[in-house]
UniProtKB/Swiss-Prot annotation:
Gene3D superfamilies: YheA/YmcA-like. This is UPF0342 protein BALH_0781. Belongs to the UPF0342 family. NCBIfam families: PRK13676.1-4. InterPro entries: Com_YlbF, YheA/YmcA-like_dom_sf. Transmembrane segments: none annotated.
Length: 118
């Protein structure tokens, strides 16, 4: 009997939620949200990040001023231990999710590789 792919996806969702890095990420995010200075800085960083992404998606040039502002925010972020921990944990979780994505996409990769070799 074939498993329903959506059921497997929900199992994966549950496994991610139970992952130690995800639990640490939730704790780190709560710590950032509980500290007004960290929260404000994190919100500023996210706003800047989204603005730069939007500019890139619209084909707009990222100016020297944009780069300078981003660098200044990054320097301040690196000085905030709570945000640094949050970002490091998020990066570890992103690696896990990237690995899972490679596994999920393997059948398509093999299909297209076989097509090119034929």
């Amino acid at each position: 009997m074939t498993k329903n792919i959506h059921d497997v996806a929900y199992e994966l969702q549950k496994a991610i939620a139970e992952n130690d890095d995800f639990k640490t990420l939730k704790e780190s995010y709560a710590a950032v949200q509980a500290d007004a200075a960290s929260k404000n800085l994190f919100d500023e960083f996210r706003t800047m990040q989204l603005s730069l992404q939007q500019k890139m998606m619209q084909g707009q040039e990222i100016t020297e001023e944009d780069n300078q502002q981003a660098q200044e925010v990054v320097v301040r972020i690196q000085q905030d231990a709570k945000i640094t921990k949050l970002m490091e944990t998020e990066q570890r979780l992103n690696v896990v999710i990237g690995d899972v994505n490679k596994i999920i996409m393997k059948p398509l990769e093999e299909l297209y590789s076989a097509q090119q070799q034929a």
